[in-house]
Swiss-Prot record:
InterPro entries, sorted: cNMP-bd_dom (IPR000595), cNMP-bd_dom_sf (IPR018490), Env_Response_Regulators (IPR050397), HTH_CRP (IPR012318), RmlC-like_jellyroll (IPR014710), Tscrpt_reg_HTH_Crp-type_CS (IPR018335), WH-like_DNA-bd_sf (IPR036388), WH_DNA-bd_sf (IPR036390)
Region (Activating region 2B): 126-127
Domain HTH crp-type residues, every copy: 164-237
Region described as Activating region 3D: spans on this chain: 115
Residue numbers spanned by region Activating region 3A: 63-64
Region: Activating region 3C, residue numbers: 88-90
Identification of the protein by name: Fumarate and nitrate reduction regulatory protein
Stretches the record annotates as Essential for the oxygen-regulated activity: 23-32
Region of interest called Activating region 2C, as start-end residue ranges on this chain: 130-131
Lineage: Bacteria, Pseudomonadati, Pseudomonadota, Gammaproteobacteria, Vibrionales
Lineage top rank: taxon: Bacteria
Keywords assigned: 4Fe-4S, Activator, Cytoplasm, DNA-binding, Iron, Iron-sulfur, Metal-binding, Repressor, Transcription, Transcription regulation
SMART domains reported in the protein's UniProt record: cNMP, HTH_CRP
Amino acid sequence: MISEKPAAKRIQSGGCAIHCQDCSISQLCIPFTLNESELDQLDQIIERKKPIQKGQELFKAGDELRSLYAIRSGTIKSYTITEQGDEQITAFHLAGDLVGFDAITGDQHPSFAQALETSMVCEIPYEILDDLSGKMPKLRQQIMRLMSNEIKGDQEMILLLSKKNAEERLAAFLYNLSTRFSQRGFSPREFRLTMTRGDIGNYLGLTVETISRLLGRFQKSEILSVKGKYITILNHAELMELAGVSKESK
């Protein structure tokens, strides 16, 4: 009979009965490809705390790197403050994403991470994770894969801002969200925007007025339906074409 003591220990220390083995987004996160023994070792270092409330920050720019954060539910935005004191959003993180990679190179966070809605995160002490990854090749490979995905996303964002017009930027943003929701088991055609239009405009380098005008244009063209923060994609193929995504790269 398998002992349940380690699990009991995790529940007491983390305050939550959900473990990596039971997590619905584990295939997108660090646990992917790990065997049961490796999962148990990872599970024992993860801290699961109370929900992060809307507006609450996981960390601030300048904070020492102590942990990486795996999002279990909710949405987190990453942003920096420019020399002029303006906020610049650099990423929107969904369930399954790992936040904090950019702090590894300098041992401190160069950006802020703030919850856009009530969110649940798994806090993973970085030094212990780094030590474990040296002993577990599969864990190291998965961390590298997650880092690679983040670099790929940054490259796509550079292309988006430098080569695409306003209409193409918003279409690409919505198509990307649709794809990410689908990967997480949610509907790729119906979803709620957890970020404001101001946040979207900030991220895409567009004004709030431009975002609102384009959403109205997309709705008039029957590409999508907009009801407040709720988006329904009516013509996925047309949105995909407008976003500049080929069927081969889908």
